[in-house]
Amino acid sequence: MDQEMVTKETEKYIELPLLASRGVVVFPHMVIPLLVGREKSIEALEKAMVKDKEIIILSQKDEKIEDPDPEDLYTIGTIAEVKQLVKLPNGMLKVVVEGIKRARIIDFIEIDEYFEVRAEILDQTVPEVDLEMKALMKAVLNKFQEYIKYNRNLPSETIMTVTNIEEPARFSDTIASHLELKFRQEQDLLEAISIKERLNKLLEIIKDEIEILKVEQKIQKKVRKQVEKTQKEYYLREQLKAIKEELDEDEEDDEIEEYRNKAEELDLPEKIREKVDKEIEKLKKTPSMSPEATVIRNYLDCVLDLPWNKVREEKIDLDEAKNVLDSEHYGLEDVKERILEYLAVRKLAPQKKSPILCLIGAPGVGKTSLGRSIARALGRDFVRLSLGGVRDEAEIRGHRRTYIGSRPGRIINAMREAGSKNPVFLLDEVDKMSSDFRGDPAAALLEVLDPEQNNEFTDHYLELPFDLSKVLFVTTANVAYPIPAPLLDRMEVIELPGYTEDEKVEIALRHLIPRILNEHGLTEDEIHFSSNSIYRIIREYTREAGVRNLERKLAAITRKVSKEIVEGRGRQARVTTQSIEKYLGVPKFKYEKAQKKDRVGVATGMAYTQTGGDILDIEVAVVPGKGKLTLTGSLGDVMKESARAALSYIRSKQEELGLSDNFHEEYDLHVHVPKGATPKDGPSAGITIASAIASALTGQPVKGKYAMTGEVTLRGRVLPVGGIKTKIMAARRAGLKDIIMPEENKKDFEEIPVKIKKDIRVNFVNHMDQVLDLILGGDEDEN
């Protein structure tokens, strides 16, 4: 280098033309070719060539900027010497530069068409190589050697070049220039002025790069191995194919032969057989390892597993069927009678289409287990499908085979599982289905449950008609109103009311306790439940229409007795009403007990609930005011309207009741239904509210021995209501034996067990006047 260059290098500051680079960092001692096309950069290079061929290279912060300003450039760059410059035909320059030293920009000087910068030279002093520096250099060198092993793009001679460098600054910059780094990492290394800081950064970067290269190499090895395996299989398969052709062999492999034999054995309908043969031929021509072959196999397995012609032979014996139903279910006489009727018709007319039964009742009343009993009574297979939470139509109809991961719908899968064409098919929780953007499963069920259509039910996956007409469908639901009307119309609804206390006790003694004792390894000699103890469990530890919680409580007692026996604290236990609390703790529930007192403004109604029903006091207070009606007690809209209708009726009877003409302008009425935290709704408290209002306004007490239910109209007509059995059981449990109910509910009363009828006296009414005569005074007309 000439004397002028030496002089300039000894100076602390320097002024040189600026070359802005995009996405490239030039390190000291690094030789790199650059392609230059921007006018300012070309001017700067030409200026440098006129002088001493030196230039300062700064990287742009954003390489997308075409004409960068000083704030768009990093402040630390590299002083470089232009080694070679070639003008290209398109006007661009190809230059080769060698980095010399780092420099920090102090000021920018704009001259004509390019920038000159005033910069401070940073690599002026050579640091002392102490033990820490040597250790760092050795660590970096070792990691760089490991890096070269994984990065095949670098020649092995590179390591020899680096090993011979003793100067720390040049050592670090040379290694940095050979690494495949991100632009930001390169700039960080360039800006690391301290040699030790630079070496530490370099060490961490190389470690990270080695880990990345290891993962990449592992993935490449795995992919290469898989490709080699696939190529090998393809090559061998083609060889095998060629050998068979040379030997003139047309031998089907075992898999194809197996599918053909199975199709022959099943004696499929002609349309189905054509489809199966077509799929078998397609499988034969498809490479066995291809995804398409797997799809065809799954399809053939599904089609050939279905019971196209397999029908379970029925042995219809009404006496045997009755014994089966009675042995597994206590009560439920209406349901049993309907099943026996179906069996009788089935015996006389075997070709008659099966009905669709819909069992509606509270949880735990035996809907699902009744489905199993029906299958056993008929001697058929049983299959259950829960529809709770289903919201995709494809769950019923299946997915088309064009989709990845397609599969048949749950109806076809269940028939495949049943193994026969005429099972008892229980569709559980049909009221829990919902719909979304994927379709409405309830709409898809319309075809399944329609006897006129289900003989050709087509699943999207099968694309073949399947006959469901011989299936006896039984559906279950807790309530009917969520079920769409078209679907409900296709079913014969049978309501399962809640069990009476007597029925629950019988179920416990006949079914629950023997099963629980067997499950817990106990005998009747080791534990005995008295009937009264079961009554107490039902009344004070459960609140339900069914018997699930009763079974849990009985099981809890049995577990505690088992523990006592194992610990040697007893050999047998007798569970009585007094010992219940020892096993189950304090009572959890308390049913409302009737006060039976004659009270002004208080009438007792009967409420229907999913847990067995209860009695409900309606309270009315009359206070001075302007005729305002206040309703409290968490009442629904229907119940509020019922209260307003009751008040209007009482106002229309003001003369008969002896009320003043303007009482409705002088007094406010407050109607309250206790247990305010419990939501209440429905019209069945109409006559109870009207009775309480009449009592409060006239000052005559309501006879406390009566419980009542019925809807009232503005004209005073008493309309029928639902849940009669449950309501009567609630009144009886509360100690009330005198009931007032609508005349039109006589038919419901006839269905109540005789044992309960004997304990109560029912007054059937069709007008509110009759109710007021009964509860407010006069001769009682007891039926």
Curated annotation (Swiss-Prot):
Domain (Lon proteolytic) ranges: 597-778
Localization per record: Cytoplasm
Keyword Protease: yes
Keyword hit for Thylakoid: no
UniProt-listed Pfam families: AAA, Lon_C, Lon_lid, LON_substr_bdg
CDD domains per record: RecA-like_Lon
Induction of its expression: By heat shock.
Catalytic activity: Hydrolysis of proteins in presence of ATP
Single annotated GO MF: serine-type endopeptidase activity
Keywords: ATP-binding, Cytoplasm, Hydrolase, Nucleotide-binding, Protease, Serine protease, Stress response
Binding sites annotated in the UniProt record for ATP: G361, A362, P363, G364, V365, G366, K367, T368
Gene Ontology cellular-component terms listed: cytoplasm
Residues annotated as catalytic: S684, K727
Domain Lon N-terminal residue range list: 16-210
EC number(s) on file: 3.4.21.53
BP term (GO), one: cellular response to heat
Quaternary structure and partners: Homohexamer. Organized in a ring with a central cavity.
HAMAP family: lon_bact
Family per record: Belongs to the peptidase S16 family.
Function summary: ATP-dependent serine protease that mediates the selective degradation of mutant and abnormal proteins as well as certain short-lived regulatory proteins. Required for cellular homeostasis and for survival from DNA damage and developmental changes induced by stress. Degrades polypeptides processively to yield small peptide fragments that are 5 to 10 amino acids long. Binds to DNA in a double-stranded, site-specific manner.
Protein name stated in the entry: Lon protease
Provenance organism: Halothermothrix orenii (strain H 168 / OCM 544 / DSM 9562)
Lineage: Bacteria, Bacillati, Bacillota, Clostridia, Halanaerobiales
